[in-house]
From Swiss-Prot:
The lineage of its organism: Bacteria, Pseudomonadati, Pseudomonadota, Alphaproteobacteria, Rickettsiales. This is UPF0301 protein RT0098. NCBIfam families: PRK00228.1-4. GO terms for cellular component: cytosol. It holds the Pfam family DUF179. It comes from the Bacteria. SUPFAM superfamilies: VC0467-like (SSF143456). Belongs to the UPF0301 (AlgH) family.
Amino acid sequence: MCDKIFHNLSGKTLVATPYVITKGIYHKSLIYMLSHTEEGAIGLIFNRLVNHVDLKSFFKIKEDKITSQVIVPIYLGGPIEHEKGFFLHSRDYNKNLLLDFHNDLAVSSNLEISEDIAFGQGPKNSLFIVGYTAWKPGQLEEELEKNLWLVMDCNKEFIFADNPENKWHNALKHLGIDEMYFSSQIGNA
């Protein structure tokens, strides 16, 4: 039996195929991969808009600093640790980064970025995401073998595009795939 070759998907986007038949969180989801190693993987779903929040009240920014509300959408990044918030943002903002990628994206998770966004000094593009998605060692590779995910290069214009409900269909279109081409049978040909 041959050893499987490991391909690092950090900085890539996972596109759920229709084979992710559950109507839950992963159905038609898009996941930006933060880290993918032989020890497992972590990602953020970026097309599950769940609500809007006032940054001032959510992050308890001092009232005297900001006079008006700054409402931002909240995305559900996955089923793990919903009390953790992340900003997936353009690389033009580089203060206290949690993760820095070579594809013009970064991740921050601190009060400073929320204050900078509230003052109009934050990144040009950002998504506020609560929670994350994680896989155990080998789990993501197994799901890829079962055709549950497609992999595409990251495109920040795509990630930050309006209308999150259309992003999954647009991802398939970007990959040249019509949803109708997927068989109702799960498996490999």
